[in-house]
């Protein structure tokens, strides 16, 4: 709709679109947000097995930085920027968390066929059925080249939010 408006209104202003992947990172309030809940489920052991799901991760601070960079860069006009630092499977997130002291994270990864069976018993998992086993590959090349965007490692962001949730007593 925004692109259509710009086109139909004879370019009344500049427009750049920022499309982040799964936005994660420490919260400035007690509300951890929906995206971080996926990390909480893995870190707390509420996800007893690592299902074959892959997500692209990007830190909320890096999304904010990309917005500022786009506003400051005239070359961003008319561009769409995908933002992702890294694509990770849940099993990789679980391994990272276990390595850093979150011993409730799942140690066993299930294959797609078993995850599909398990989805019959979990409404959250049932929502992911179309994405099970699908490898994603979002590239942020344009944001890096045009905006000079340089995101922090996804692993750092995952550990930041996991540690914050642990400190707040949210991982039980």
Language model regions located:
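Active-site Tyr-X1-5-Lys
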Residues: 1-16
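Mid/C-terminal beta-alpha module of Rossmann-like enzyme folds, strongest
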Residues: 66-126, 156-172
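Conserved C-terminal active-site "lid" loop/helix of NAD(P)H-dependent oxidoreductases
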Residues: 118-150
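A conserved pocket-lining segment of Rossmann-fold NAD(P)-dependent short-chain dehydrogenase/reductase
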Residues: 23, 29-30, 36-62
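Glycine/proline-rich active-site loop of Rossmann-fold NAD(P)-dependent oxidoreductases
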Residues: 10-13, 25-38, 70-80
